[in-house]
């Protein structure tokens, strides 16, 4: 696509799935609008760290170590790799001791998330302190498996975090079954794409003044993720 756009001298804007840096470097009129996947992982780690700092009783083994399970997206997918890596890095950066009990792919899918969580519960049971999922659909699936195992009733609880702030996930936040999620702000990304494309169509060089967004390295507009919890869900989503 980049080669064809370059040959036709047509500016090209990619959205939400970042091309490789070497592809972005092929031409000076290629742009990307999106969010940094590592930031979403960092925010998941922050949500969990805040929870365990406030709830020391949440360590099921009473050893001060967060024993977690990870349900990941598509193997090799950049978002899955970065969210997985940086959620754990953020926990450690917050001073948390962590141990991975198990990790498996749920392929971004709710049913597969439920299946993987059921398998984790069968093997590890109450040893699990936290569930980290690369997206909300898998987190909601994990919650279904936890409900079937008696969690979220009679004080039995495991914190679950996801990414995307989907409508069903926000309902789970309000229900108290999902601890937190991270918003990939589609509205702001759409505005950035429109502003950028408009400037390019006029033959101008994009900058913060004419797009309203910082242009990093002359090619990238990064729209920050936002932490969403039960406490701020209505406000954050009202701004979407």
Label each residue range with its predicted role.
Residues 67-70, 91-110:
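Short beta-strand elements in bilobed, periplasmic/extracellular small-molecule ligand-binding domains
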Residues 18-22, 38-39, 74-78, 105-110, ...:
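Solvent-exposed loop/turn segments at secondary-structure junctions
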Residues 32-64, 113-114, 165-169, 185-204:
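Hydrophobic alpha-helical segments within soluble ligand-binding/sensing domains
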Residues 2-39, 57-65, 166-174, 178-179:
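Flexible loop/hinge segments that line or gate small-molecule binding clefts
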Residues 1-12, 86-87, 101-172:
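Hydrophobic alpha-helical
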Residues 64-75, 79, 191-240:
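Hinge/cleft segment of the Venus flytrap/periplasmic-binding protein
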Residues 40-44, 78-97, 112, 116, ...:
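Short, solvent-exposed amphipathic alpha-helices that sit
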């Amino acid at each position: 696509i980049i080669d064809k756009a370059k040959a036709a001298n047509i500016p090209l804007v990619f959205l939400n799935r970042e091309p490789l840096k070497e592809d972005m470097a092929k031409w000076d009129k290629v742009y990307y609008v999106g969010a940094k996947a590592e930031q979403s992982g960092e925010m998941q780690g922050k949500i969990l760290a805040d929870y365990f700092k406030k709830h020391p009783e949440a360590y099921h083994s009473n050893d001060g170590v967060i024993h977690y399970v990870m349900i990941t997206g598509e193997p090799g997918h950049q978002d899955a790799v970065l969210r997985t890596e940086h959620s754990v890095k953020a926990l450690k950066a917050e001073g948390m001791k962590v141990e991975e009990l198990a990790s498996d792919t749920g392929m971004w899918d709710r049913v597969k998330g439920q299946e993987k969580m059921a398998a984790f519960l069968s093997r590890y049971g109450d040893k699990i302190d936290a569930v980290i999922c690369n997206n909300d659909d898998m987190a909601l699936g994990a919650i279904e498996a936890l409900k079937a195992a008696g969690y979220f009733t009679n004080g039995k609880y495991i914190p679950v975090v996801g990414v995307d702030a989907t409508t069903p996930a926000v309902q789970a936040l309000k229900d108290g079954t999902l601890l937190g999620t991270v918003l990939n702000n589609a509205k702001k990304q759409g505005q950035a794409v429109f502003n950028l494309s408009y400037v390019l169509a006029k033959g101008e060089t994009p900058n913060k003044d004419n797009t309203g967004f910082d242009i990093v390295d002359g090619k990238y507009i990064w729209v920050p993720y936002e932490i969403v919890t039960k406490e701020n869900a209505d406000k954050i989503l009202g701004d979407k």
